[in-house]
Amino acid sequence: MAQVQYYGTGRRKKSTARVRLVPGTGNVTINGRDAQDYFPYETQLLILNQPLAATETQGTYDVLVNVDGGGFTGQAGAIRHGIARALLQADPEYRSTLKSEGYLTRDARMKERKKYGLKKARRAPQFSKR
């Protein structure tokens, strides 16, 4: 008996998340660990639960995630993007809700590259008049 699964890929900064939604009780597993153990801050847990809260599907799907690259904030954003795409696959009627909240939009902001002659992307060395 094949189990129904919905897939979504999310990206944010340097992070990529491959998300599977399986009908279940609402457990979130990230790279084989529980979400509360994986993320150090509560805000990241709130970020990844946003699409489920918007569509009122908390507790109806188990979320299985493989995420790599970037830091915790980028990974949380990538997971949110992936969950939103997977929910859209599960029920296309969620599109208007997810789109209006901005969860289907790929956040294109990236780290600006460092330029030569500068200390960071825009930070110039200290100016000395004499």
Curated annotation (Swiss-Prot):
- Which Gene Ontology cellular component terms are annotated? cytosolic small ribosomal subunit
> Do you know which SUPFAM superfamilies this protein is assigned to?
Ribosomal protein S5 domain 2-like (SSF54211)
Q: What is this protein called?
A: Small ribosomal subunit protein uS9
Q: Give the matching NCBIfam families.
A: PRK00132.1 (NF001099)
Q: Which family does it belong to?
A: Belongs to the universal ribosomal protein uS9 family.
> Record's InterPro entries?
Ribosomal_Su5_D2-typ_SF (IPR020568), Ribosomal_uS9 (IPR000754), Ribosomal_uS9_bac/plastid (IPR023035), Ribosomal_uS9_CS (IPR020574), Ribsml_uS5_D2-typ_fold_subgr (IPR014721)
Q: Name one GO biological process term.
A: translation
Q: Which domain of life is it from?
A: Bacteria
User: GO molecular function of the protein, one example?
Assistant: RNA binding
UniProt source species: Oceanobacillus iheyensis (strain DSM 14371 / CIP 107618 / JCM 11309 / KCTC 3954 / HTE831)
Q: Does the keyword Repeat apply?
A: no
